[in-house]
Amino acid sequence: MTTKTLTEEPSRKRFKTNKSEIIFKEAYLEESTTTSSSSSSDQPPRQIKFTQKHQSILLITHLKDPLKVQTEYPIPDLQPHEILVHNRAIGLNPIDWKGKKYGFGIYHFPWINGRESSGDIVKLGEQVDTSSYAVGHKVIISSTSYRDNRTSTFQQYTAIDSRLVWKLPESFSYEDGATIGVGLVTAGVILYNSFGFELAEKPEQINGTILIWGGATVVGLYLSQLAKIYGLKVIAIASTKHEEYLRKLGVDYLIDRHLSEDEIIEKIDEIEEVESIEYGVDCVSKETSKTVLRILDHKLKKEEKEKDEEEDVKNTQVKPKFSGIVGIPKEYPETVDVRDVVIKRFHEDVSYGRKFIEITNKFLNTRQVEPVRFKQYKGGLHIIDDALKDLEKIGANGEKYVVSV
């Protein structure tokens, strides 16, 4: 874990920069007269009333204008199933800088970016299950409802569906929690929705292999861990400087991404334990998606050739499945079954999203899935712009960029 600090670590009240003084107001929590007076540490936090009306946000006023911290911005109102979360650590994603730079994913001005965070519940909607969630609970959130700025995380307080949040494991820091949302949801959608894996705490084991191009991306890191839970062998295409870390997370075979396409295929063919590749995922680009598709096509045809000549052998071969996070080429081999990555299912299909949260929260609690390592920026909303510039320039290099608020 590496850290970049704007100044000395700020108090939660205020800090100074060379540009301005940013004030972060603490939530004012007033005890309700109707609640229990129990002070046992084993009891859930008491019901308390949240009275704060305004917050600070990081605002996009125009695509060409710099990001702006604005104070006295209204705190989101809650829908019946929603909770209000005081963000304590915020995870950054490439779309947070790409959307502004290239003009996509921003539907109106002013606009608030940010897709994931971890923090404390400060307010409950009318229909929140109070047997599961209470004010003061620490949670992890992932906002896949991109058009709703209330769910964005580049602000002090985020409104989010209570049925779609993880509880932060006791052994995790807020920064650990901020690495999880988007990466784990995306990895899960690929396995459970695109590839049709069983969504279960103790799933049936799968005898097969998955190839992940971009094994050191955050999605790749979580995908490798989930794949191992299902018994898959994992081939990762990534920089060899991450080899020790990737093997720790479950990667069986690492192939240097700097090799040529033909050299990578040759390296894969040299793996004696892998006769076939049933699943392929690209986490990087449309161009690398083409390469993964070529590898899957090559491996299937090679397997067919090596088999004894049997009647209708080609018709009985199961097509390998492929999903590309960034994009899928318009043309691809007929030998590959190409599947879309439907991220929005997480929030649109609440029954699926809720079950996904339930199962993966158990994986996190038992450390079957570990939070990925992170690069920490201290300085709250005001340092997000610097962190995004680093993310654009350097890229996510086997770690998550996280801002502590």
Show which residues each predicted segment covers.
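Terminal helix/beta-alpha structural elements that buttress the NAD(P)+-binding lobe
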Residues: 4-36, 40-79, 86-124, 129-405
